């Protein structure tokens, strides 16, 4: 049994390159392996699977920022941009969205240029599908602080919550999501074309939503957490 477990652990680690032993342990449990995290840690070390990480810089002590807490899906989202480059060195941008409560990413857009009008187009498409937040946390970038998005938000009856300039910690949910995107996708691929970048980044978004266990969600995936929340709310409304 242990040899089979060792082989399966190696296989998972080969696919989930940036997953540590704790998240790999969750995946093994999901597959039916009845093993504790200590055994997985021992095999993980014996197989030399430890992730190489950069040494963390010592941070200056600062006051902890208390972020607004969402209590249901679509109460509060965050959105932001990430930059990367093709194999040819041509730059492209990634427009990211994340739900604070479920940690789901409702959409991700990749292109060489993403103006405010494109941001509105994406949000309007989601709203047409019945997916619309009450509040969106954003920075003060021109795509978010311009008139196009402001007018759209007013028409749709939602609030834009701008963080203070130079305070990305106030947008921690999207910063965390962007970090995972870079570590688990952008840093692992050479994109030859913008089409390839779109395909691989969208595939990562779907995998993140549907298959990636999230520690803040009690090791559920974002999609599982959202589905279970909707189910429990439906049961409450039915009076059971």
Which residues are covered by each model-predicted region?
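Basic, flexible linker segments flanking DNA-binding modules
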Residues: 1-76, 142, 167, 221-230
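Hydrophobic beta-strand scaffold residues
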Residues: 51, 159-160
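Conserved catalytic and ligand/cofactor-coordination microenvironments
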Residues: 20, 114-116, 140
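C-terminal domain-tail junction helix/linker
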Residues: 156, 179-240
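RNase H-like two-metal-ion nuclease catalytic core shared by retroviral integrases
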Residues: 138-142, 146-151, 160-182, 193-202, ...
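Short hydrophobic alpha-helix segments
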Residues: 108-109
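Mobile genetic element proteins and their domesticated derivatives, centered on retroelements
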Residues: 9, 24, 40, 80, ...
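Mobile-element integrase/transposase regions
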Residues: 34-98, 104, 117-125, 129-133, ...
């Amino acid at each position: 049994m242990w040899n089979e477990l060792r082989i399966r652990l190696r296989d998972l680690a080969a696919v989930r390159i940036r997953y540590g032993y704790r998240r790999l342990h969750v995946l093994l449990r999901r597959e039916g392996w009845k093993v504790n995290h200590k055994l997985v840690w021992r095999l993980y070390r014996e197989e030399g699977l430890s992730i190489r990480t950069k040494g963390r810089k010592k941070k200056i002590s600062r006051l902890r920022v208390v972020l607004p807490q969402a209590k249901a899906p679509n109460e509060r989202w965050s959105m932001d941009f990430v930059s990367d480059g093709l194999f040819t060195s041509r730059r492209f941008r990634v427009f990211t969205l994340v739900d604070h409560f479920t940690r789901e990413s409702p959409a991700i857009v990749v292109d060489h240029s993403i103006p405010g009008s494109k941001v509105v187009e994406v949000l309007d498409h989601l709203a047409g599908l019945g997916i619309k937040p009450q509040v969106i946390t954003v920075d003060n970038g021109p795509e978010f602080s311009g008139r196009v998005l402001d007018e759209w938000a007013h028409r749709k009856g939602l609030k834009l919550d701008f963080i203070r300039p130079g305070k990305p910690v106030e947008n921690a949910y999207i910063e965390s999501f962007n970090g995972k995107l870079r570590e688990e996708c952008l840093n692992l691929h050479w994109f030859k074309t913008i089409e390839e970048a779109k395909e691989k980044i969208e595939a990562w978004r779907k995998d993140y939503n549907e298959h990636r266990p999230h520690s803040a969600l009690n090791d559920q995936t974002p999609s599982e957490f959202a589905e279970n929340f909707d189910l429990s709310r439906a049961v409450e409304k039915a009076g059971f």
